[in-house]
């Protein structure tokens, strides 16, 4: 009989968990599991308090689900990754573990941690088994003709869909209940430093809750997703991002439920649908993270970005963070982030574009602020989104494209329903004036307790275009490539 240890990290689920499935293949093996928290490491990586809280409550939920399978989930608090490695080695010795099972993580610090774990445990005679679990296909399975990581989403998407037509990744079922063990018990998970600071009504706890949310979206919202997804006042998106980010649900299972609930539609229609596009963008950004490790250090993927002279006005940055820029759609989005730890995707694009191309603040400042506040914070997606907005990443928006807050506001929140929800100071402003409340305030001589715009949009746009153009030209004159 062998003793197998499952090392849970960013995969807090029992359904379709590759490491869990593989560890439970032999009915005679004893299976235990472990989660090691690393508060200092998370702090250094700017993981948000809301995400940590969300994760801890799901860890408790996972522990109860594992107990139903007669699998103990042990818990230990270390400080950082290096400290966690030493504890893992100690744990394996203490519990006489034979085999360690875990699912890969792809950021550079996590990859180095796993390299050290495998090296040190293997030297001590333990068998270490890692699995690709977070993505539909591994980076080695999706390569361009030069056997390199794709840099253009369209070509990446085409390759993935081609692979899916040939092979739909299968989901692993929940393992069968292990033989009863008198040592089975519920270990204590410390919540001494964790507050319930996320909205449980907005993001209910539990793998089953995530599964139900996915199924309800596919049944009731999928058909209208393309038409309604850009309107932040509508309940039109899946709201699955926190669950995907913490590994409470898998992208494979998202695809499985989509294909099952919409089985009357042709496969290619589903694989090219706008919602599945979002799953593929997630895959794309992860493949970039794997293929270009410097992304983990917030380095851009174009060389000319270093020539941009950022203004980095601290007062403007604080106004942006607090939702006090005087641009209603920007401020409503930022206040949604501050309140919920989540922001509608359209608003993420608008607010990030505004920070980088109108306020001319280094995109890394925005990246840091988002990741330290988002409940669905994810290095690959957050970095990819910010580099996209700043026009310095792979397949990014052209630098000449700058989101106009007024146009975006009128288009996607015409009646101001979303704006008034998060900016109560504007509750008395008529709907058709909500996008430029100060003009109405002057006309009616009605004072509103809301800041004036901190910049002139038109002037800031001209300045931005000039600076970005100069940066590209300067690099070109020096004989260097633009990307």
UniProtKB/Swiss-Prot annotation:
What task does this protein carry out?
Answer: Involved in repair of UV radiation-induced DNA damage. Catalyzes the light-dependent monomerization (300-600 nm) of cyclobutyl pyrimidine dimers (in cis-syn configuration), which are formed between adjacent bases on the same DNA strand upon exposure to ultraviolet radiation.
Source organism: Buchnera aphidicola subsp. Acyrthosiphon pisum (strain APS) (Acyrthosiphon pisum symbiotic bacterium)
Pfam families given in the database record: DNA_photolyase, FAD_binding_7
Residue positions annotated to bind FAD are 225, 237-241, 376-378
Q: Where is this region: Interaction with DNA?
A: 278-285, 345-346
Residues recorded as binding DNA, renumbered to this chain, are 229, 408
Identification of the protein by name:
Deoxyribodipyrimidine photo-lyase
What's the EC number here?
A: 4.1.99.3
In its UniProt record, a GO molecular function of this protein is: deoxyribodipyrimidine photo-lyase activity
The keyword Lyase is assigned to this record? yes
What is known about its subunit structure?
Answer: Monomer.
Could you state one GO biological process linked to this protein? response to light stimulus
Q: Family per UniProt?
A: Belongs to the DNA photolyase class-1 family.
Annotated residues that bind (6R)-5,10-methylene-5,6,7,8-tetrahydrofolate are located at: 109-110
The Photolyase/cryptochrome alpha/beta domain is annotated at: 2-136
Task: List required co-factors.
Answer: FAD; (6R)-5,10-methylene-5,6,7,8-tetrahydrofolate
InterPro entries referenced in this protein's UniProt entry, alphabetically: Crypto/Photolyase_FAD-like_sf, Crypto/Photolyase_N_sf, Cryptochr/Photolyase_FAD-bd, Cryptochrome/DNA_photolyase_1, DNA_photolyase_1_CS_C, DNA_photolyase_N, Rossmann-like_a/b/a_fold
Note the site residues: Electron transfer via tryptophanyl radical. 310, 363, 386
